[in-house]
Amino acid sequence: MLLTAPLLVLCLLAALAIFARRGLSLYPRNAVGFLHPSAAAGGGGERVLWVAIDSIQKDDIKNGIDRLYVLYCTQTSGKSDDGRCEPPQEYLARVVQKQFHITLPRPIKVVHLRSSMTKWLDGGRYPFLTLLLQVVCGSILLFYESCVVNTMTPTVIESVGIPGVYPLLSIFAGSRIVAYTHYPIITPVMTQRVENGEMRYNNKGAVARHGVLRKAKVLYYKLFAHIYRWMGKFPDLVMTNSTWTKGHIQQLWGHDVPVLVYPPCAVSHFMPLRKLPHQRINTVVSVGQFRPEKNHMLQLQSFALALPRLPTDAKLIMIGGARNEEDKQRAEAVKVEAQRLGIADRVDVRVGAPFSEVSESLAQCCIGLHTMEDEHFGIVLVEYIACGCIPLGHRSGGVCLDIITSPNVGFLAATAEEYADCMAEIFRIKNDEPETYRKFQECGMATIARFSDESFGEKLTASLRRHLPS
């Protein structure tokens, strides 16, 4: 009787593996899958996905390879411009063309995943033990939906960052896994901040102040780091989007050489909008969702400190999206803080501005502002440079390691005082030394050439050749 339960579990796991592996025989050996539940969203991660598919297809065409491409994503539907209800696949193609100006050269098969399963990947659904429950529960349900309810391809590219699904795909589905990692879920720095009792958006005051709770959270983080390290052993190829992410993944997962593949940035869209220094107005523009880690309050404090040294018509324009009610409340809190600081008439908060408005604001501003600490890459800084404004970013993460790597490209800061000094200096350069401002623009353009769609495609396909059967 003692052996019955373990034996039953082993039999169930074996049956699951046999069933989940049926995709190995149902799909061609060289079929490739793309596991990206939020494929219809318009973020930077989705741009990576669609440029990746486009690049792989073009490389296959160039080399005469016939391949099946399968996208696993949450089912979406909508209406066309004329009000007609569109089939999900037609709607997806239209959205991608509209958002990213991409029309794939070959068709793809779309496997629709039920939102009732993929919604559990959202960390907001877990009020406590968020990291652990999001990764474990979300990954199990994603595996069930993609490999048990549906069938998985022999090779799968996971481009969101759902590490819990790696061991399931490898052990049960038998798939080769390629992971494109945007950022590590946990880092030693996060654990250290909890140990030090630092209050952060992910370390509330009650935990930071209470010794026992703080020690419990440190233990939880360290336990999760070990689980995360184990999950990272399963991908056959790991690619990262920045030097900062590469260093952390190498340390956490033990991969000897994660491949650095910078994300594709739409630099060609912004370049025609660029204006010369004398055509630019005295504005500081910040672009970023109203999430806590974006640190909009630091932007207000810095601007308030700098104002006495800025032109009399200088303004701070804060543009961002609001994912939910909490983000909307944060945007309102920014307005309240601007009022408290006495700079409300010099601050313009715009929630959900259209892309055309964002582009126009960046094309004519003086400074592109960024204040997020440990940003894994910082694609918005690339967009600032492409638009011709001087970037002012946080001295951390991929921002300083990959983008503003030279004082000839932009400025870096960490405190409100440093940001204020940099703002004053950039405005001085624009208004008193336009030729110096032009040199910043030229150096910036030379720097961001490596972040183009073409550079991404070349590095991606070269890295994949050993892992994608022809």
Q: What does each of the following model-derived ranges do?
A:
Residues 386, 390-394, 404:
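Short hydrophobic beta-strand element within catalytic cores of glycosyltransferases
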Residues 104, 331-356:
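Nucleotide-activated donor-binding/catalytic signature segment of Leloir-type glycosyltransferases, i.e.
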Residues 373:
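Aromatic "clamp/platform" in nucleotide-sugar-dependent glycosyltransferases that forms part
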Residues 34, 239, 274-294, 300-305, ...:
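Conserved donor-binding/catalytic core segment of Leloir-type glycosyltransferases
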Residues 406-417, 425-432:
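Conserved acidic donor-binding segment of nucleotide-sugar-dependent glycosyltransferases
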Residues 431-470:
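A charged, aromatic-enriched C-terminal amphipathic alpha-helix characteristic of glycosyltransferases
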Residues 197-238, 246, 251:
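Membrane-proximal helix-turn-helix segments that form the acceptor-binding/catalytic region
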Residues 43-51, 282, 291-307, 329-332:
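A conserved mid-protein helix/loop that constitutes part of the nucleotide-sugar donor-binding site
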